[in-house]
């Protein structure tokens, strides 16, 4: 069996910059049309993988979400992701379809900032209502459910259907 070899710094840089260089030359969709398609895909799904990290600690957790008011909302009892969230609010979440071939790719990577919403605040109650979680059920819990709010900064969406519109399959939406 061959030994694992590491890449040089230059090789890591080249690999890391691959999509930046390719995207600079790509055919882009109109940002309004892209935003509409991105939001349709987000709303058509409800499960993501949320990656959190701080120092050498990394965690990636499958979670259910809702999306409204241009943010992702995730209720969570707890878990190790909170070790990282205490120290680093930068997160990445991904939503993707089952792989069925290159002509049928759909998935997105969302880079954003997480915050923890105060339990039973107006924002918390609204998110519970949107998710159809009865407030009385939340109030009866021995410990309040945590609510993670993620404000996207950038959404990178790979969708093979974009080629039908004359654009490249990988598009980036910069969020404000």
What residue spans do the PLM features occupy?
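Short Pro/Gly-enriched beta-strand edge/turn motifs at strand-loop
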Residues: 43-49, 129-132
């Amino acid at each position: 069996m061959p030994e694992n070899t590491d890449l040089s710094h230059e090789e890591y840089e080249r690999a890391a910059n691959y999509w930046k260089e390719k995207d600079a030359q790509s055919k882009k969709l109109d940002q309004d049309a892209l935003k509409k398609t991105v939001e349709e895909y987000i709303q058509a799904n409800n499960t993501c993988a949320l990656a959190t990290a701080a120092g050498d600690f990394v965690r990636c957790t499958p979670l259910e979400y809702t999306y409204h008011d241009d943010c992702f909302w995730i209720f969570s009892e707890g878990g190790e992701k909170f070790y990282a969230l205490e120290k680093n609010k930068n997160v990445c979440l991904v939503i993707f379809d089952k792989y069925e071939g290159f002509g049928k790719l759909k998935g997105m990577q969302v880079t954003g900032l997480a915050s923890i919403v105060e339990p039973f605040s107006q924002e918390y109650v609204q998110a519970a209502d949107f998710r159809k979680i009865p407030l009385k059920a939340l109030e009866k819990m021995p410990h309040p459910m945590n609510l993670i709010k993620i404000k996207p900064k950038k959404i990178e969406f790979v969708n093979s259907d974009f080629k039908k519109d004359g654009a490249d399959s990988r598009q980036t939406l910069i969020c404000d």
